[in-house]
Structure formats: C-alpha cells, structure tokens
Amino acid sequence: MNAITFLGNSTMIPSQCILRAFTRISPSKYIRDTSFRSYPSRFSSCINQYRNADSDRIIRPTNAVPFCTDRQSSVTAQVVSEARSHSASTTCANDTTLDQIYTKNGLNVKPLVVERLKRDEKDEEAVNEDEEGVKRDGFEGVKCNDVEEEAWRLLRDSIVTYCDSPVGTVAAKDPTDTTPSNYDQVFIRDFVPSALAFLLKGESEIVRNFLLHTLQLQSWEKTVDCYSPGQGLMPASFKVRTLPLEEDKFEEVLDPDFGEAAIGRVAPVDSGLWWIILLRAYGKITGDYSLQERIDVQTGIKMIANLCLADGFDMFPTLLVTDGSCMIDRRMGIHGHPLEIQALFYSALRSSREMITVNDSSKNIIKTISNRLSALSFHIRENYWVDKNKINEIYRYKTEEYSMDATNKFNIYPEQVSPWLMDWVPESPDSGFLIGNLQPAHMDFRFFTLGNLWSIISSLGTPKQNQAILNLVEEKWDDLVGHMPLKICYPALESSEWHIITGSDPKNTPWSYHNGGSWPTLLWQFTLACIKMGRPELAEKAVTLAEKRLQADRWPEYYDTRDGKFIGKQSRLYQTWTIAGFLTSKQLLQNPEIASSLFWEEDLELLESCVCVLTKSGRKKCSRAAAKSQILI
C-alpha cells in the first residue's frame, strides 16, 4: 500500500502562489512503487490577470495545480513517506527565485521547512557555468553563419510558453499553413533535438520546465473506449490552451494527448523512453543532478520502467509493441519487436540504472533493469545482426527444427531472404546492420536508420557491429543519404507489399514519408554515432550536404524519391525538429567532447552477468560466451 504523510499547513515566507491538491484518485489503479501519485483532472491550469505580466506562478508538485495570484497563502504539502535518506526537493520551476520544499535527514520529519533559494553568483563562477547553470567550455568564440542564424531564429520562434515560462517547441510553425492539424502541439519525441540544441547553447530553463510539466501529465487519467492503459505512460504531445474566465481573467491549461486523438489511437510507447533519455542528458550537460534526484522525478522514472518491465506472455527480452508506436507512427509493418523501440528501450534502461537512487526500496528494480539489459543486449547482438555470412547462413537454414539446440530458433524460411538483400549487402565482412524486426517465422530485413544509430549510441551492438553499421552507411551512401540525409528505412515497400503491409496508405507511398522518405532530423543522431565511433568526417559530409538545401527549401519535414531529391509531397515546412537536428549536429561537430555526455560506452559488467535460468536447470548450456567473444575492446 502507498503511504503518505500529511504535514499540516506551513506558512510560506513569503508566498504569492497557491498549490491546490487534487483528490480525484482512480480507485481502480495503484502504483507498485512506494511513492504516492494522484490523478488530476483533465487540464493543468494557470490563472492570470488579463494583461498582467507580473503575475506570480508556480509549477505544482506531483499532486497540485498552479494558480497565479497576488495573494499570500499557505501550502498543504503531501510528502512521500518513503523518502530517501538525504534531502530531496520539489522545485517551483517557473519562478525566477525558486521555492524549495524538502525534508531534513530522512523521512517523516516535522515541521516542513520552506526556504527561498536565491541565485548565488559566486557559486556559479566556482563551477564555471553561465547564468542558466550550463557548462559552456568549448563554445566561446564560435560564430554562426547565415543558415545557423536563421535556424536559431526559427527555433526560438517555435517556443511555447505556459504561465509566461518556456515549456517546449511546436512541431512545425509554417506561417502560410492554415490547417496545422496537431503540428501546433509540443511532442515529446520532436522536442528532444530542440532540447539538446538549447542545452548545448547554455539554455536549460526550457528543458527543465518541459521535463517537469510532462512528468506531471504522466499521472493523468487517460481512457480510450472505457479502457485505461498502464500507469507510467507519457503523453505523445500536449497543447497550451487559453480559456476565458470572468472578470477579465484567462486560464492557461495543458491539454495532453496520450493517443486518444492520434491516427489509429496508438499509445506513444517511445515517449517515456525519450523522456528518460532527455532527463539523463540534462544532468550530464548541465551538471545539475538535483532534478533527477527529486522524489517525484524518481517516481516517474520507476513508473516508466515498471510499465516497460511488466511481465507478460513474451518469450523474448525485447519490448512487444503495436504498429505506429514510435517515430514511424503509421502502419508500416513494424508491429512486434521493432529495432527502434528496442534501441530506445535499452538506452532508457541504461539511463534509469544510472539515475535511480540506490536504497532498500529501489534495489529490486535496479536488479530487474540490469538483468533485462543483459538479456536484451545478448538477444539483439545474436539474433538481429546480419552481414553477408549471416545472410548466407539464413539462406541455407533447415526449417521445422524441434529441439533445444535448433540452429533456426525462430523457424525462419529461407525464402524470406529477398533478392534485393542478396544484391545489396556488401561483400566486405566489415559491413553489416541490425535488421528491423524479429518474430517467429519472420525477419524484417529492411534497414531502419534510427534503430541502427541508437544501437551505436547506446552500445546495444558490439563495438565491431557498431563500426560495421557505419561502414555500411559509407558504402551505401547513395542509397541511405543521396541528396538529403537520411533515409528513415531502406528499401521502400512497393507494389503488392505496399498494398498489403501499409493498407494502401496514400501518405506512405513508395519512397515517401515513412516508406523510404529522407528525414533531416536524423542528422543529429547520425552525427552523435559518428563522433562516438571516431568517424566525424562522415557526419561533416552529411551536415554539409544538408546545409546546402535546408534553408532554401524552408526546412522541410521530409524529402521524397529514391535519392531524396524532392521535398515531400505532404511535407510540412519550417519543421522544428529539422531545424533543431541541424543545429544540434553543428554544435556537436564544433565541440565533439560534449558528445560523450550523450552516448554510452560498452558495459562489461552487463556481459559478465547471465540470467539464463536454463543453465541452472542443466537443460541447455549458456551461450553468453558467444556474445562476449564478439567484443573488440
């Protein structure tokens, strides 16, 4: 059972904000974590006096909603009884001088202490940080060219504010577009490159606010056809709406979308994974780890992890998802265990293991995460990897093998090896890639760029495999990059495959949109992977190629045709993550040392641990040694 401690009314010194606790809790839901969460109503609101720019505001803690007001008031606090042994803060992120609420020396301590924290210039100078608290080493003296200057102007124009504070960037802001659909919302996955661009620029406020507000939205009730998904689900996006009130007042509300309004009504599986990855990046770049140490943030991390690690019927350590649950958010035949989700899942688990505070209450989830990481890396490295030799082995597979020692474990039919793959895979044994999906009797041999890049970034693949992926990109540059980096997948589904797999989707026609379209936003992830593997020249080549066209083409969302020559037929212009991806790539190339904050090196400890239960029973020998033998240090 969840236990909460109500510490009576404590007068704020001084206070100009009201925290109103919600008591609307879903009786049918509970949290396995020991931290307390409530279920607020549909909107988070901030009431301002009309035209009053000086109205005070506060970001509510987990169970409260902010109301901007001019009156002094008291705060009723709810504190988790399972607090860590050292103080943890719940911070008012929107105030220029921050209110910090904390408990002293552990749990169940009274009275609640409220202090006003003011900025200390001496402390900032001591850690060599700017006024936002972001490390700036390596960026001084860097001048922007005309393309970068326009990109920064457009990125800043896309900023969304809530209670006069920045909370994200819209997906696209084309001044000529009269029907923005949902492109005027803040998407979690779309905001990641924007967040990194701001962090690398030394501007952390917008990222901190974004992380806290989306965390608060995590706890809201979400229902589709009278059914609620598991706790911990992050929204795909949110929109700031302004509602009129009486007496010349207005109310700003956050309206999230958990998939209820999405095309196909698909839950955004990747949103929570991206949120955890961004939270780690915030701490690594700014050096401010207090955010991830907060009780509410720790609870948010655990809720996402618990949702992903929940027991089910699956026999594999990979995450089972439906079609359209990630960047490829339309029907494209990726249901099952798509590589993109597995790579982000692995990255999020590694981030969680770094950030979760170690204590008695967290040791079980940390152990579960470590075991899953070990099993997941082994499974992907062994079963998703293909090169010329592996494809030849699959081509000669025997089928219908019923035994514990079967070579063709997934009963893959050799006829699935398409002629295009035999012609396309390089001759060199130093080139290869991770396939897009693996299920019983099914291998998706398409090359999915985001999944392969994140396998490099997170070290999901072995060092040898990671180098081989970049070798393949270099050898197949015309196919995967062409006139505009980078193909989201290769090759495109055509003819009967397009009809059957996409359902004749008019937006995903061959070599368009998600079906083989070219997406400039993938540039920053390609840059990060290249820097990690010591191949920055590949990234520079791609960035230079994109820089020649993006400004003239008005920063499109994607490009069409086999070589990415034409702007996509339904592509939005002034797409924010296209702009932000370009800026982030430029900054990473200007200061490659900072890239180490965003990727992971090989974790040898994961390779040493084996969770193979069959080994203990003696039914089968563990093949962990095979995975370890692939590693090149």
UniProtKB/Swiss-Prot annotation:
Reaction equation(s) it catalyzes: Hydrolysis of terminal non-reducing beta-D-fructofuranoside residues in beta-D-fructofuranosides
Transit peptide, from-to: 1-71
GO CC aspect terms: chloroplast; mitochondrion
Keywords from the UniProt entry: Carbohydrate metabolism, Chloroplast, Glycosidase, Hydrolase, Phosphoprotein, Plastid, Transit peptide
Coiled coil listed as a keyword: no
Gene3D superfamilies: 1.50.10.10
Name of this protein: Probable alkaline/neutral invertase A, chloroplastic
